[in-house]
Design a protein with these regions (language model features):
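A metal-dependent hydrolase metal-coordination microenvironment
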Residues: 28, 33-173, 179, 205, ...
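Alpha-helical transmembrane segments and their juxtamembrane interfaces
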Residues: 12-13, 67, 98, 241
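Positively charged n-region of N-terminal signal peptides that target proteins for export
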Residues: 1-5
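Charged catalytic cores and adjacent phosphate/nucleic-acid-binding surfaces used
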Residues: 19-54, 73, 133-141, 183-380
Length: 380
């Protein structure tokens, strides 16, 4: 009872400070408001590069999204993103009877608020062709008012080339989203033509809640940049279960020289990216390996357990110094078989004394459609 009374006494000044009374019969319940704060996504530098959190595929009411552009900026700030692109559809604008659709307008409305929020705003559009070939995102674009709205197949190439003529970074979107249409998930002639013409620079390997594994192989085999995006139309909070610590919108991790649009573009051109979707990472092996190595550290053995039969087991602490999530399955050696590294957390693993290393597959990663990152943990 004493503890309850103490708690009650402590609450009295808290409630008094949360409520504002203007002395004229009005009480403001400020304690019921959502706190104004920005998440801080912790990912250490990788090989000297900053890891920037970027979403280059989102929508607003200026195409088929459900929100005004400023909401996208607010969400990006709250969720700890570094860079954002509004990529409203060029050829598909179902709200045009209610909204004065202009292809540059969503970006224009955000320029000042993004600067104030310290969000790097990248200009972009979604070139929305029929499937196949499907949709292409163009970012780092110029004036989009002259982009092609005609969706006929004869205009497919020219629609993309208008963005290419502006030196845009172009990536192919969500290939498996219409599996019932023949050619929707194939490397078709038009895509080969764009690729050879250097008008295709990346592929969206993860779109929202779907991983397109064949697209990862294409990126690796053809030297294209691995991309991941939310493709958000609704509110992020309506789509993602943010009650789980590891859940967040799908995004591209960009390993950039600094936090500027120019550095992001250079990194995209160089292919220094990893796709991130809550528990899962996908990318070229060199980048996924470097990211894992920057985040995960195995400490020297801190304890040797001596069994009744005289056998000795060494214990180690393995730490995850990031907000990423890793699952490991033992492949070679005699030691702890399954390890889950939660964000900013550590686990204990063990191995018989004398064991020099353990080899794990990081099953929460993909470096090809059928391959997880393999890591060797040296034991000291």
């Amino acid at each position: 009872m004493r503890n309850l009374l103490l708690i009650g006494l402590f609450l009295i000044p808290t409630l008094a400070s949360a409520q504002r009374n203007n002395g004229k019969g009005m009480i403001y319940l400020d304690e019921n408001r959502r706190p104004v704060l920005r998440e801080n996504i912790m990912i250490p530098a990788v090989n000297g590069f900053e890891v920037l959190k970027c979403d280059f595929h989102t929508h607003t009411v200026f195409s088929d999204g459900h929100v005004w552009p400023n909401v996208r900026n607010q969400e990006a700030w709250q969720e700890g993103l570094d860079a954002l692109a509004i990529t409203d559809h060029i050829e598909y604008t179902p709200h045009k009877e209610d909204v004065n659709v202009a292809h540059n307008r969503g970006y224009a409305l955000l320029v000042e608020s993004a600067k104030m929020s310290n969000i790097l705003l990248v200009k972009g559009s979604e070139i929305t062709r029929n499937t196949p070939p499907g949709h292409f995102n163009a970012i780092f674009t110029g004036d989009a008012s002259g982009y092609t709205e005609d969706r006929s197949g004869e205009q497919d190439r020219s629609a993309v080339m208008k963005a290419a003529a502006q030196n845009a970074f172009i990536f192919w979107n969500h290939h498996g989203w219409q599996p019932g249409i023949e050619g929707s998930y194939e490397w078709i002639d038009l895509v080969e033509d764009l690729y050879k013409s250097k008008a295709l620079h990346g592929i969206e390997v993860i779109n929202g809640f779907g991983i397109h594994l064949k697209a990862l192989d294409w990126c690796i085999d053809k030297g294209l940049t691995v991309m991941a995006s939310s493709d958000m139309h609704n509110l992020v909070a309506h789509e993602y279960d943010r009650s789980k610590d590891y859940v967040h919108r799908t995004m591209t991790l960009v390993m950039a020289e600094d936090r500027t649009p120019e550095a992001i573009r250079e990194a995209l051109d160089a292919g220094r990216t990893v796709a991130w979707a809550s528990k899962y990472l996908a990318g070229k092996e060199e980048h996924v390996r470097a990211l894992f190595g920057a985040c995960v550290h195995l400490l020297p053995s801190h304890y040797t357990e001596v069994k009744a039969n005289g056998n000795k087991t060494n214990w180690y602490e393995i730490r995850n110094n990031s907000d990423l999530y890793f699952e490991l399955e033992l492949k070679e050696g005699n030691g702890t078989r399954h390890v889950v590294l939660y964000p900013r957390a550590a686990q204990l693993i063990s191995a018989p004394a004398g064991t020099t290393s353990l080899t794990y597959d990081v099953t929460s990663t993909y470096v090809r459609s059928d391959t997880h990152l393999s890591v060797v943990l040296p034991l000291k």
